[in-house]
């Protein structure tokens, strides 16, 4: 992050680091099978892309495309051929970068709502109804006017989920359900 609050340098360094790892992995690709290549990429490349990605959550489309190109390069290494479409990413069981980052925001929002270990000063503000309504049984988060904040991003994404998913207090089940929802959104977007 620069003094102008832009993430260009961070993404540039991240891209350089990931492409360096992929260059090193290409030297051993003839000695590895598909599953090992996939595991190596998930551990050495995708983990770098995922690390603290919710901190710089809404980023410009240009930077998001750079991150997506890194993921395409990683998928190309795994498949052993050129990859530039979302369908190939989904075949690997991965989410594209936009949805992957949204999934991490949703998981953090779930922890903020349901986890007792979440710091009290970082709690997400929920909508409280003055009267008892049928819609008050589902959880909705308050969306602040200030965008580019965790509260705003998490609330916008969390409120768009179906009510049965929002009310799920089991983290593992919530993660699986949101993963399926986001994969379905990717498939619909690709068509």
Stretch-by-stretch model annotation:
Residues 1-191:
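Hydrophobic/basic alpha-helical segments
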């Amino acid at each position: 992050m620069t003094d102008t609050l832009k993430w260009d340098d961070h993404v540039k360094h991240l891209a350089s680091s990931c492409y360096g790892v992929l260059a090193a992995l290409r030297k051993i690709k003839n000695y590895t099978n598909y599953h090992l290549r996939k595991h190596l990429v998930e551990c050495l490349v995708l983990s770098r892309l995922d690390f603290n990605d919710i901190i710089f959550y809404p980023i410009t489309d240009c930077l998001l495309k750079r991150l997506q190109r890194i993921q395409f390069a990683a998928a190309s290494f795994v498949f052993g051929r050129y990859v530039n479409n979302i369908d190939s990413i989904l075949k690997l069981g991965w989410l594209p970068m936009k949805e992957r980052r949204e999934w991490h925001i949703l998981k953090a929002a779930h922890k903020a709502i349901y986890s007792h270990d979440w710091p009290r000063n970082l709690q997400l503000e929920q909508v409280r109804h003055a009267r008892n309504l049928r819609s008050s049984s589902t959880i909705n988060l308050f969306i602040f006017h200030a965008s580019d904040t965790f509260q705003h991003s998490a609330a916008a994404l969390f409120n768009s989920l179906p009510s049965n998913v929002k009310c799920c207090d089991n983290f593992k089940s919530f993660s699986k359900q949101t993963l399926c929802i986001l994969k379905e959104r990717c498939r619909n977007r690709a068509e």
